[in-house]
Amino acid sequence: MEKDIKLAIQLEEEYLNRKVNLHDGTANIYEYLNQAGYDNIDEYNNDAQEYIITSQDYVVVEEPYINIELALPYMQAEKPALLYSINCGEKYGFVPNSYDNESLLSQYGYKQIKLGYDNSNGPILSSDGDLRIFIVLNKHPYIDIDNLFFHKKLKNFLLQYYDDVKIDNNDILINDKKICGGIINNYSNNILVVVFQINFIDKYNDIINICGKSQKIPGYIDNKLLDAEKIKNEFIKWLHIQ
């Protein structure tokens, strides 16, 4: 039987209604998914995520830089969007709200940009020529998006150019050097935001001086081998943007 992901998602909703709202403990997810050609829950989950992400009507906007203020109108309007920046003309340090050493960033020529949330990490340094991606997408009421959905796609793409590519938590390493960091965050009950910083500029000394030494060695992608525009275009393909 040919798989029908749209039907499968509708059938999962019927299953959840029966199990949760009607308190029917005999409800079996496979009885529902089999009607749409699925007998493997992992395959269904992967296809469902792909469908939810790629069936949205995104706008693509090039920005001089990326920060929470530029993305906010799309987030508040619940309008799916891919914002990106390559040629920003300045150096930026993206920091959690609690970061309090703006003078150190300024000393090395970086303009501080608050991320709008807190985490345990220090500044994320970004230079003219790096690729910054900010995706706004609508959440589904019961289908969760894997935190590493885009990491896995990017890793597989990079393996076309490099033999040694790994995912390490929220980072991607090439030849054991960190070239990329990315996160998926809940903005509201209805909106997810995906943020990526992909390094094409050598910032090794600045990262060591500002962030201190880390177990992960800072690295970057050689733009003679692979440029930022090409990776940006891959994100557009992954979102099925025409």
Region spans (language model):
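Active-site loop/lid in soluble adenylation, ligation, and acyl-transfer enzymes
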Residues: 2-18, 25, 45, 49-125, ...
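Long, positively charged amphipathic alpha-helical accessory segments at protein N-termini or as interdomain linkers
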Residues: 5-7, 14-19, 50, 138-166, ...
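DPxDG-like acidic metal-binding loop motif
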Residues: 125-139, 191
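Beta-rich nucleic-acid/ligand-interaction surfaces
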Residues: 166-185
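Surface-exposed interaction regions that form or flank ligand-binding interfaces
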Residues: 53, 59-61, 71, 175-179, ...
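RNase H-like, Mg2+-dependent phosphodiesterase core
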Residues: 40
